């Protein structure tokens, strides 16, 4: 795509103005944060809170309905109950709003009645040409412009190269942790919910071509878009050097049943086949939520760094972990590096006489009997200079976290 701004998702991430239907000034209500986040994060466009009774919300003029807003908002977030959502969607369509986010749950994920309501809304969206995220969704987030549609208080966002696609609010309880404690560097985030209109293929088609996206994290409970197009986009991302980390739930029969009750997802196909296909198109599958976020963060931080080869050194404090990591190296198709005789000679002075250095390195006893800083700096410098070493897995004890950055920049 030559001009990413022409993609229909672009204005979801860069809305010129926002209507927040269901916004509240009550700090104990989740919808309070719809307005407060935009103000704290510095969103620069007009904000139009919509509330049937309140005249003002956090110092901003409120409107009893979207029809009373003087302008036509670029994006509307409908954060009300399931029963109110269809009527307010109709109000947005009549107002001429072209992009909506439907926050409420209680549609296809609850069974036949909810599915019927969702299908009726989908028909009205298609007939009007409006594009919709959700229902059962809460997004988007774009740190570059201070945009955060969330029920959690966000004081700051760190912008970076990681873009995230979710099928549910899996990320929502972790938002403050991701941005504050885990220090996640985010480019864009979209929660697709029940995927009544926009789906994972739409999101990928935008982010794969987004020049600010360097890594993509994708959470799926089902695939609603064209499966071949989905795989083509994953392969295209790999060809562009954009890693895609996939967390797909519903792998077991029980998980598939839970997914259906959560977002109304139909989990298709054999999971082992899905696993192999992901490998063929160059995507990376995460086995757990923690691994998903760890992989996303690591790939974003080390973007542009490529291994010269597959020879790995392991150095840990307990020897047991070194054994576990040695197994993992083999499982991932890597090899244990053959450390040169010269490197081993440089390391001998910092190792006890009875503990000869070898890969994998067990540093527990060594650091007890020597200066831990000297041991670690000597190890890093020696391994970095060894032409037979392409990468190292180093376990860094807490007492060394204050070392200068130059120590860790030797590789």
Model-derived features with residue positions:
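Catalytic-core regions of core metabolic enzymes
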Residues: 1-411
């Amino acid at each position: 795509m030559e001009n990413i701004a022409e993609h229909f998702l672009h204005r979801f991430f860069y809305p010129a103005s926002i209507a927040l239907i269901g916004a509240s000034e009550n700090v104990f209500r989740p919808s309070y944060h719809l307005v407060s986040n935009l103000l704290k994060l510095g969103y620069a466009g007009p904000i139009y809170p919509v509330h049937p009774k309140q005249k003002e919300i956090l110092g901003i003029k409120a409107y009893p309905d979207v029809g009373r807003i003087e302008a036509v908002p670029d994006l509307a977030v409908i954060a009300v109950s399931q029963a109110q959502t269809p009527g307010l969607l109709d109000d947005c369509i009549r107002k001429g709003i072209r992009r909506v986010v439907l926050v409420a749950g209680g549609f296809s994920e609850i069974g036949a009645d909810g599915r019927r309501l969702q299908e009726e809304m989908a028909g009205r969206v298609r007939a009007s040409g409006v594009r919709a995220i959700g229902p059962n969704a809460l997004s988007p987030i774009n740190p570059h412009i201070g945009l955060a549609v969330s029920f959690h208080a966000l004081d700051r966002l760190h912008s970076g190269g990681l873009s995230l696609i979710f099928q549910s609010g899996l990320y929502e309880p972790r938002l403050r942790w991701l941005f504050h404690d885990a220090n996640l560097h985010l480019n864009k985030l979209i929660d697709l919910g029940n995927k009544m209109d926009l789906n994972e293929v739409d999101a990928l088609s935008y982010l794969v071509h987004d020049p600010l996206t360097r890594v993509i994290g994708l959470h799926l409970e089902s695939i609603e878009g064209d499966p071949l197009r989905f795989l083509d986009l994953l392969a295209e991302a790999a060809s562009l050097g954009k890693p895609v980390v996939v967390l797909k739930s519903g792998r077991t029969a029980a998980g598939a049943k839970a997914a259906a009750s959560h977002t109304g997802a139909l989990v298709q196909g054999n999971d082992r086949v899905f696993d192999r296909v992901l490998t063929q198109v160059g995507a990376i599958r995460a086995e757990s939520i923690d691994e998903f976020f760890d992989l996303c963060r690591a790939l974003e931080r080390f973007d542009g760094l490529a291994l010269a080869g597959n020879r790995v050194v392991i150095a840990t404090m307990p020897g047991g972990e070194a054994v576990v990591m040695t197994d993992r190296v083999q499982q991932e198709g890597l090899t244990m590096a053959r450390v040169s005789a010269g490197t081993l000679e440089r390391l001998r002075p910092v190792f006890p006489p009875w503990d000869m250095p070898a890969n994998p390195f067990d540093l527990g006893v060594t650091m007890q009997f020597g200066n831990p800083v000297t041991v670690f700096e000597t190890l890093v410098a020696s391994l970095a200079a060894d032409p037979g070493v392409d990468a190292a897995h180093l376990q860094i004890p807490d007492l060394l976290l204050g070392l200068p950055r130059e120590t860790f920049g030797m590789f």
